[in-house]
Amino acid sequence: MSSVYIVEEHYIPYSVAKKLLTDVIRSGGSSNLLQRTYDYLNSVEKCDAESAQKVIEELSNIVSREDVRAILASICPTTSDEVRSILVMDTNKTYTSEDIQKIIDIIRKYIKS
């Protein structure tokens, strides 16, 4: 029996979680819970894992909190109201209208059409 050790912990967007689950399922580690989680992630995914990682990287200049960047890359909001409803979680920073527009522009570059 092999042991699993957690070396690091990070917030990840839905599409990255889906990619990791795909790898687990393909290696034979499937269960009903994993399959249902995969199906859910597949239904809400708005960009692929690579694009989501790029969104997170580009957002790091604007949004300092990793969890907020992961949520933005998961949900892919495209209006200022949607972005503001997520950014409210970051109580350490006030975002300008320019910041919000930059976030929307970054997300729109990578979102699935």
Curated annotation (Swiss-Prot):
Q: Name one GO molecular function term.
A: DNA-directed RNA polymerase activity
User: Where is this protein found?
Assistant: Cytoplasm
- Catalyzed reactions per annotation: RNA(n) + a ribonucleoside 5'-triphosphate = RNA(n+1) + diphosphate
> Which InterPro entries does the UniProt record give?
HRDC-like_sf (IPR010997), HRDC_dom_sf (IPR044876), Rpb4/RPC9 (IPR005574), Rpo4 (IPR010924)
Report if keyword Transferase is assigned: yes
Q: What does this protein do?
A: DNA-dependent RNA polymerase (RNAP) catalyzes the transcription of DNA into RNA using the four ribonucleoside triphosphates as substrates. This subunit is less well bound than the others.
Which lineage? Answer: Archaea, Thermoproteota, Thermoprotei, Sulfolobales, Sulfolobaceae
UniProt name for this protein:
DNA-directed RNA polymerase subunit Rpo4
Provide GO CC annotations from the record: cytoplasm; DNA-directed RNA polymerase complex
